[in-house]
Design a protein with these regions (language model features):
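A short, compositionally biased
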Residues: 3-10
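ATP-dependent carboxylate-amine ligase
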Residues: 7, 17, 21-30, 36-201
Length: 201
């Protein structure tokens, strides 16, 4: 069994040598499945439940992959800026949707989607709206299709400077931002901007 929230993920594993509870430092239901797979493989080679739990609890994730950070004005940022494809965006959206307060998706284009690129971007815009994301700020030519499908509450930006200005004006203690986009979009520039500002908290 497991319980998800933005701060951590609590799990209870039932293994051949007994049950054990643990707290994961990584976000998302998909990471619960990753932990289950790691636990199964570890059990198969004879690692104790205590060592499995300890190892899983120590893993803090990978930079740019669903990392929770604080930014100015008390807002929360989920840094998933390292890369993006439709499935990873959906996984990140499910994490954002589970948060309280206003939910803002900051989306850069997804690359390497071939002839289906427009369709995939449209789907992400529609899915974000349907699962309860409040606002969408988008950067890149393809993400304009996400904005169109999202509808009211979505804005498309031609440059990162205008996007950052708009995001800064939206920050408040009840706001959670998800920053997501393919590597070539360099969405980590936005993360760095807000991390720098976070020192003023």
């Amino acid at each position: 069994s497991y319980q998800l929230n933005l701060a951590d993920t609590r799990m209870k594993l039932k293994l051949p040598d007994g049950a054990i509870e643990m707290k994961l430092r990584v976000l998302g239901k998909h990471n619960v499945y990753n932990a289950l797979a790691a636990a199964a493989a570890s059990t198969a080679i004879g690692i104790s439940k205590e060592n499995i739990a300890s190892g899983l609890e120590l893993f803090g994730g990978v930079d740019g992959r669903l990392q929770q950070k604080k930014c100015q004005h008390g807002a929360t940022m989920i840094d998933d800026s390292y890369n993006a494809n439709p499935e990873s965006v959906r996984a990140a959206l499910s994490v954002l949707a589970s948060t309280l307060g206003e939910k803002i998706l900051i989306l850069g284009d997804m690359g390497e989607l071939g002839d289906n690129a427009v369709d995939f971007h449209e789907c992400i815009g529609e899915e974000a709206r349907l699962i309860g994301i409040d606002r969408l700020f988008a950067l890149g030519k393809l993400s304009a299709y996400s904005v169109k499908k999202f509808g009211a509450g979505a804005q498309h930006f031609k440059n990162i400077e205008d996007l950052i200005t708009e995001v800064e004006s939206a920050l408040a203690p009840n706001v959670t931002l998800l920053i997501k986009g393919s590597r070539f979009m360099q969405m980590d520039r936005i993360v760095r901007k807000f991390e720098m500002e976070a020192s003023d908290i």
